[in-house]
Amino acid sequence: MNAEQREYIGIINQSAEEVILIKKTGWEEVNLPGHAHGKCQIIYTLAGTLHVEIGSESYFVPEKHIAWIPGGAEHKLSSNSQQVSMAIFYVNLEPLGENDPKGEFAIYTANALIGENLKFIASKGKVIEKEKQPDLYNFTLGFFNLLPQMSPGKELLLKSLVIPND
């Protein structure tokens, strides 16, 4: 992990509970080793394919899909030397019980409504603070809380397969 990545993870971990952080990438290669942070990480792949590793499992997040990584989950991100463009959101979302999908890793399809809302939220800067932008903060928090129900269906998790040579 390079110094810039360590610094940003520190910013995430030190940010207040009522702050939503937003990071947009251009076309870039992703190679982030295993890490965890207290906020839920919601990654919208605008273009390209992202690989997410959680524990011993590896998943593909194709273009126009969302990776939902719960807070505290150890994960690795990579693009296997390919370039990817993403909008990444870090937000405090506490699961409401064992069966709440907010507490589990998931991949969701982004239909037009979801995609446009994510782009709108991402266009509002790098930080949304409840104290300074209460309406935008409440909209964003409500949107992310409803996202698992709004998605056309939780995708089958696209796992990497090991194919034998024989």
Regions found by a protein language model. Give the residues of each.
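Generic protein-terminus/edge-of-domain signal
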Residues: 1-53, 59
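Short beta->alpha connector loops
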Residues: 50, 72-73
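Short acidic-glycine-tyrosine-enriched beta hairpin
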Residues: 56-71
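Generic detection of short hydrophobic beta-strand segments and adjacent strand-loop junctions
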Residues: 59-61, 106-109
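Ligand-binding loop in jelly-roll beta-barrel domains
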Residues: 73-105
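An amphipathic alpha-helical interaction segment
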Residues: 89, 109-166
